[in-house]
């Protein structure tokens, strides 16, 4: 099983840390396992509480049903159903910027 380095950043929340997450663990679950508290609500990809923005790297969020193609194209990802597919950098706490 592949494991990736996932950097989570949020200037407002004073987060800038890199954690290891395997390909079968969501970004949100990996963060929780490492003691990083990120916002969430549904845990099923059907709301926007946990939305982040992929700045670098590849992810799989094929299970999400909330974001439209334009939002996904801009890099937004629902971290509760997003799996790393490479080393990546993700801005957390992005719900206010989703519009």
UniProtKB/Swiss-Prot annotation:
Keywords assigned by UniProt, alphabetized: 2Fe-2S, Electron transport, Heterocyst, Iron, Iron-sulfur, Metal-binding, Nitrogen fixation, Transport
Superkingdom of origin: Bacteria
Residues involved in [2Fe-2S] cluster binding: 42, 47, 50, 80
SUPFAM superfamilies: 2Fe-2S ferredoxin-like (SSF54292)
GO biological process: electron transport chain; heterocyst development; nitrogen fixation
Cofactor: [2Fe-2S] cluster
Every 2Fe-2S ferredoxin-type domain range: 4-96
GO molecular function: 2 iron, 2 sulfur cluster binding; electron transfer activity; metal ion binding
Co-factor binding comment: Binds 1 [2Fe-2S] cluster.
Family matches, as PROSITE patterns: 2FE2S_FER_1 (PS00197), 2FE2S_FER_2 (PS51085)
Sequence similarity: Belongs to the 2Fe2S plant-type ferredoxin family.
Biological function: Ferredoxins are iron-sulfur proteins that transfer electrons in a wide variety of metabolic reactions. Donates electrons to the nitrogenase 1.
This protein's name: Ferredoxin, heterocyst
Organism: Trichormus variabilis (strain ATCC 29413 / PCC 7937) (Anabaena variabilis)
């Amino acid at each position: 099983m592949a494991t990736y380095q996932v950097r989570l950043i949020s200037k407002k929340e004073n987060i800038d840390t890199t954690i290891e997450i395997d390909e079968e663990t969501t970004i949100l679950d990996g963060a929780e396992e490492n003691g990083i508290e990120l916002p969430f609500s549904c845990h099923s990809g059907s709301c926007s509480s946990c939305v982040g923005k992929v700045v670098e790297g590849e992810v799989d969020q094929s299970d999400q049903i909330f974001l439209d193609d334009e939002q996904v194209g801009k890099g937004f990802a629902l971290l509760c159903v997003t799996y790393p597919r490479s080393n990546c950098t993700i801005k957390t706490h992005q719900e206010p910027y989703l519009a």
